[in-house]
């Protein structure tokens, strides 16, 4: 697999059996995801979006075909090896953030980091840097999950997804249960993470969320019906725009304000709207 491709599928199919009938959710998908890209999967309800995300990340197994992630054919791994691969190579962001209630914020991240790194000091340094990145103050890092707002918990969830330096982060409707304030904050954060070179694959039905992507895949009836290359969001200087404008070192605004619009946002919106209309969305 070329170095610039981090995920590849070959004839990927997923079929579920219900009683005496079969439901073909994914049908012979050939797909490549470039390293460092922000790929967005869209489509109507029941199109197979989440099923595809789970197959790409090893949370589900294909009925037929292959899934190769970071050079490893995960469709051939046994259960234990697949679990280790997910732990070491994949980060996950879901609508519901499943933090361990009995552990503080920092210990939730440390528990993940110590699975892949032996040095407690190095893990703590990385966890603190990631919590700085997502804008969670030091005073809040000793809190327990029950003490966090929905937006704070999602920020911690994204930081936790990055602790193990994953080959890709997989996000399934990450703003689906957040209000507009926190949704904007999480989108800014994902943009920041992508601007630093992280590969992201995200499922969404939301136009504003999709605009953060560099590539849009439209799924319907288990097949990729169309693809749109939006390219990277660019600032006035031509650099990637993440969650904090053109400042590459700034953290996401903890108050949840949207990042400044990139000069090409209007053109991107027009292109995406036209594409979705063509797809019958």
Predicted regions and their residues:
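Conserved ABC ATPase "signature" region
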Residues: 72-73, 121-139
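Conserved catalytic motifs of ABC-family nucleotide-binding domains
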Residues: 165
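Helix-to-loop junction immediately C-terminal to a conserved catalytic motif
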Residues: 57
């Amino acid at each position: 697999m070329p170095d610039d491709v981090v995920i590849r599928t070959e004839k990927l199919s997923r079929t579920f059996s219900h009683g005496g009938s079969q439901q073909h959710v994914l049908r012979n998908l050939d797909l490549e995801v470039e390293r460092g890209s922000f790929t967005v999967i869209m489509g109507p309800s029941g199109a197979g979006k989440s099923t595809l995300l789970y197959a790409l990340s090893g949370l589900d197994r294909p009925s037929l075909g292959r899934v190769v992630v970071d050079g490893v054919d995960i469709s051939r791994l046994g259960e234990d090896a697949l679990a280790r691969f997910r732990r070491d190579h994949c980060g996950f962001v879901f609508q519901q953030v499943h933090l361990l209630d009995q552990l503080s914020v920092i210990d939730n991240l440390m528990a993940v980091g110590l699975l892949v790194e032996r040095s407690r000091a190095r893990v703590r340094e990385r966890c603190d840097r990631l919590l700085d990145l997502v804008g969670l103050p030091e005073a809040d890092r000793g809190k327990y999950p029950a003490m966090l707002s929905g937006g704070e918990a999602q920020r911690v969830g994204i930081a936790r997804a990055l602790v193990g330096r994953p080959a890709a982060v997989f996000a399934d409707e990450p703003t689906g249960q957040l209000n507009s304030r926190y949704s904007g904050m999480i989108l800014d954060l994902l943009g920041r993470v992508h601007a630093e070179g992280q590969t992201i694959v995200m499922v969404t039905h939301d136009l504003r969320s999709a605009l953060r992507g560099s590539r849009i895949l439209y799924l319907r009836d288990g097949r990729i019906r169309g693809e749109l290359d939006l390219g990277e969001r660019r600032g006035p200087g031509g650099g990637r725009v993440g969650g904090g404008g053109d400042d590459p070192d700034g953290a996401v605004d903890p108050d949840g304000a949207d990042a400044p619009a990139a000069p090409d946002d209007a053109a991107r919106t027009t292109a995406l709207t036209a594409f979705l209309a063509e797809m019958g969305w």
